[in-house]
Amino acid sequence: AGTVGKVIKCKAAVAWEAGKPLCIEEIEVAPPKAHEVRIKIIATAVCHSDSYTLSGSDSEGLFPVILGHEGAGIVESVGEGVTCVKAGDRVIPLYIPQCGDCNFCLNPKTNLCQKIRVTQGQGLMPDKTSRFTCKGQLLYHYMGTSTFSEYTVVADISVAKIDEAAPLDKVCLLGCGISTGYGAAVNTAKVEPGSTCAVFGLGGVGLAGIMGCKAAGATRIIGVDLNKDKFTKAKEFGATEYINPKDYDKPIQEVLVGLTDGGVDYSFECIGNVKTMRAALEACHKGWGTSVIVGVAPAGHEIATRPFQLVTGRTWKGTAFGGWKSVESVPKLVKEYMAKKLKVDEFVTHTLPFNQINESFELMHAGKSIRCVLSF
């Protein structure tokens, strides 16, 4: 109310340069322009993509920037022409928007809305400017969301209005990781009942992939990870077996082919490593196996396999945000969670105050957390 149309001064975690810890700074957040929404972020989680960009490996990474793309909050104000949300609405910012009228949105085969893709990749709002400043300097936006700030501004096509009873410190995770892994199984792979699946990488996305395989009726779900401590959690989400590549002296794809009478029906690479991407494809069954790439590999890395792997009937696919058309799907995923059909709370291993954000990056790198939720 008192802030509408005014610049808001608030706390944010600023990444001034690659490879350095984030700094908690006071920043200025300009009011939303036409077709923009200013959101008070209530909770945000830290995802591997944030740390990937912070590390400097991201070809689209720009600095200084406000990172963060797994958040939830309350609309503070809207710019002119905004009809999808109003002040007071509970929302999840979306790093893949849904404008509803580009040729991607009109095609049922994809969720990759292109309406604001170019400016989003440049770290700017659709009008090619930023809403963030700090110490007189422009700060870039990140993935169209920038949730590591008490207030953020997003395009009106990059916001999903959700059930107002939903706990924001939990459903923020549906803004990326859980939706991504779960959708990779149910939308992209379209896992069938009775199938055998292998999930490489048992972080948040991999666990969500396991949950998706189970929901789709898979009977064998094999978790693959170098960290044996991850298996207990994987079992809770539905994994039936666990294998550790360190325990074998032959390639893990050969181990999987041996364990599954010729290979798995579906495999999921939830790490972002081109070598495991190859292993995941080659672990698939001849004639019908499908491997889905979910993890994002560092810029410039390339995948390799022998073409014969594909000639003999394997399929290699990729997915972004689990194939969900965001504006229409995220509210439904929140409803599924509210109806206890989707695990979300179980992904939260740590909760910290926002000013301890660097600690949450450390927990993630040490493999100690699945998701750490920060609250303001």
UniProtKB/Swiss-Prot annotation:
Class-III ADH is remarkably ineffective in oxidizing ethanol, but it readily catalyzes the oxidation of long-chain primary alcohols and the oxidation of S-(hydroxymethyl) glutathione. Also acts as a S-nitroso-glutathione reductase by catalyzing the NADH-dependent reduction of S-nitrosoglutathione, thereby regulating protein S-nitrosylation. GO terms for biological process: formaldehyde catabolic process. GO terms for molecular function: alcohol dehydrogenase (NAD+) activity; S-(hydroxymethyl)glutathione dehydrogenase (NAD+) activity; S-(hydroxymethyl)glutathione dehydrogenase (NADP+) activity; S-nitrosoglutathione reductase (NADH) activity; zinc ion binding. It catalyses: a primary alcohol + NAD(+) = an aldehyde + NADH + H(+); a secondary alcohol + NAD(+) = a ketone + NADH + H(+); S-(hydroxymethyl)glutathione + NADP(+) = S-formylglutathione + NADPH + H(+); S-(hydroxymethyl)glutathione + NAD(+) = S-formylglutathione + NADH + H(+). Its EC number is 1.1.1.1, 1.1.1.-, 1.1.1.284. Belongs to the zinc-containing alcohol dehydrogenase family. Class-III subfamily. It comes from the Eukaryota. Binds 2 Zn(2+) ions per subunit. Zn(2+) 1 binds at C47, H69, C176. It is found in: Cytoplasm. Zn(2+) 2 binds at C99, C102, C105, C113. One of its GO terms (cellular component) is cytosol. CDD domains: alcohol_DH_class_III. InterPro entries: ADH-like_C, ADH-like_N, ADH_3, ADH_Zn_CS, GroES-like_sf, NAD(P)-bd_dom_sf. The keyword Cytoplasm applies. This is Alcohol dehydrogenase class-3. Its cofactor is Zn(2+). Gene3D superfamilies: Medium-chain alcohol dehydrogenases, catalytic domain (3.90.180.10), NAD(P)-binding Rossmann-like Domain (3.40.50.720). Its main location: cytoplasm.
